[in-house]
């Protein structure tokens, strides 16, 4: 059986979330007992909790919601690369373009170790020029371990709008700890939530034959 890596965050009460966004909670509704044969819980969370896919409607009022977004790009061969440098943005020069080699799905690692327990306001965003070059090489899906393609303080959302121009897809909040750079099969299907601007997902990388 091919080796598999789980690149999702664990949804839990102390999950770091974007400042001001909804904290995750899992509350008991029914519990197993003399009058109830099952356990049932109620979830409270943001559409951007943990590893998630942004829908086009997140950054474009006329964009599709996550339930209407085609699924093809969320499954298939991908390339995981580590960004060099330590500036606030991942610039084109920070990526190994020979390794990317025209991949349709590109995952970009910015953390040596993912900050699972603390919110990092200084995560490395992707520069819009990097998005443009990825699009020019044939990339259709970008996945990052950062909380967003754009900086926390951005009001212009330059990277997201570069994605919009090229009809690309976005995965954010992935965890690449313990996964070597290389070629993999990506499986990262977002939940089908009508009207939602994003959705959490269980993302995995599978070793290619």
Swiss-Prot record:
GO biological process, one term: anthranilate metabolic process
Binding note for cofactor: Binds 2 zinc ions per subunit.
Pathway: Amino-acid degradation; L-tryptophan degradation via kynurenine pathway; L-kynurenine from L-tryptophan: step 2/2
Residues the entry annotates as binding Zn(2+) 2: 54, 160, 172
Enzyme Commission number: 3.5.1.9
Protein name per Swiss-Prot or TrEMBL: Kynurenine formamidase
Annotated binding of substrate, by residue: 18
Pfam families: Cyclase
GO MF annotation terms: arylformamidase activity; formamidase activity; zinc ion binding
Quaternary structure (record): Homodimer.
Domain of life: Bacteria
InterPro entries: KFase/CYL, KFase_sf, Kynurenine_formamidase_bac
Role played: Catalyzes the hydrolysis of N-formyl-L-kynurenine to L-kynurenine, the second step in the kynurenine pathway of tryptophan degradation.
Record flagged with keyword Hydrolase: yes
Residues involved in Zn(2+) 1 binding: 48, 52, 54, 172
Reactions the enzyme catalyzes: N-formyl-L-kynurenine + H2O = L-kynurenine + formate + H(+)
Family per record: Belongs to the Cyclase 1 superfamily. KynB family.
Keywords, sorted A to Z: Hydrolase, Metal-binding, Tryptophan catabolism, Zinc
Cofactor(s) needed: Zn(2+)
List of catalytic residues: 58 (proton donor/acceptor)
């Amino acid at each position: 059986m091919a080796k598999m890596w789980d690149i999702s965050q664990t949804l839990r009460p102390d999950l770091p979330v974007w400042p001001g966004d909804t904290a995750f909670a899992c509350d008991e509704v029914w519990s197993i007992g003399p009058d109830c044969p099952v356990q049932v819980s109620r979830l409270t969370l943001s559409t951007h909790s943990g590893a998630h896919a942004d829908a086009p409607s997140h950054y474009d009022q006329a964009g599709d919601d996550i339930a209407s977004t085609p699924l093809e790009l969320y499954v298939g061969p991908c390339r995981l690369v580590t960004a060099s440098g330590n500036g606030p943005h991942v610039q084109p020069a920070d990526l190994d373009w020979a390794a990317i080699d025209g991949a349709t799905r590109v995952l970009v690692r910015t953390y040596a170790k993912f900050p699972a327990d603390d919110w990092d306001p200084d995560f490395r965003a992707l520069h819009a020029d990097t998005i443009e070059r990825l699009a020019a090489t044939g990339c259709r899906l970008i996945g990052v371990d950062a909380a967003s393609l754009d900086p926390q303080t951005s009001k212009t959302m330059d990277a997201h709008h570069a994605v919009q121009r090229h009809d690309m897809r976005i995965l954010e909040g992935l965890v690449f700890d313990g996964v070597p750079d290389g070629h993999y099969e990506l499986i990262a299907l977002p939940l089908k939530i009508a009207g939602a601007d994003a959705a959490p997902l269980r993302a995995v990388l599978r070793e290619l034959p």
